[in-house]
Amino acid sequence: MKDSSRLSARGLGVTLAGRTVLRDLDLELGPGDAVAVVGPSGAGKSALLRALVGLEPAIAGSLRFGGLELVGAPTEAWRPLRRAVQLCWQDPLSALNPYLSVAELIDEPRVIHGLPRWRVGSPELHASLARVALEPSIERRRPGTLSGGQRQRVALARALAAEPSLLLADEVTSALDRPVAWALIDLLRGLRGDGLGLLLVTHDLSLLPGTIDQVVVLGGGEVVERGPARELLAAPQHPVSRALRAAVPRLPYS
């Protein structure tokens, strides 16, 4: 299971509108792993996530899932990855169809991937809501009527409905107040304990202790530092890493 669900990038590069936004990146993620990609705005974090799920064409290097090379592969070759690797966006409102109910949003990926339906009122749907700390009573509501924290949890429930082995989370706490953000991080920690692989993209190092094992620091579209979370947060070496660390003066690693 671990080998068949492993995502591996080697020398990955991405160019957008003639500008190289990511170069020579190596990354490994499998079930149960917890990796953070951190860096300032414009470092290439979101471009990386989009490339990993085929939304940005990688123009250099290798991207393999379950041992299958995907760079240059036809669209059909991406199908196994697009169920097994799910992405939660920074702004859930832009990713959730405003005309669908919560129940329909969560059921939609199951329809797409040919899984048994989770309909309104079903025990499976209610269990999926409970998993992300949402009440069954919201199942008929639409995204525009929910709070930011509720929308982010619905987006997470929707991603989990595809029964993925890996979850990519793009700045999922950036628009939330701190108590709601920490509640969401606690949910991600619990999912990792269930065997889900987690790739967390963030600029906020305060989210990493107790959540992440390995950290990759991006600056200017390339990896400037990487290492175990405890060691890197305690003694960052690169100026980009030190600047991110200085923005969070109180961490358990010092």
Tell me what each language-model feature is.
Residues 142-146, 150:
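Conserved ABC ATPase signature
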Residues 53:
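Helix-to-loop junction immediately C-terminal to a conserved catalytic motif
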Residues 120-137, 245-246:
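Conserved ABC ATPase "signature" region
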Residues 61-70:
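Conserved ABC transporter NBD signature motif
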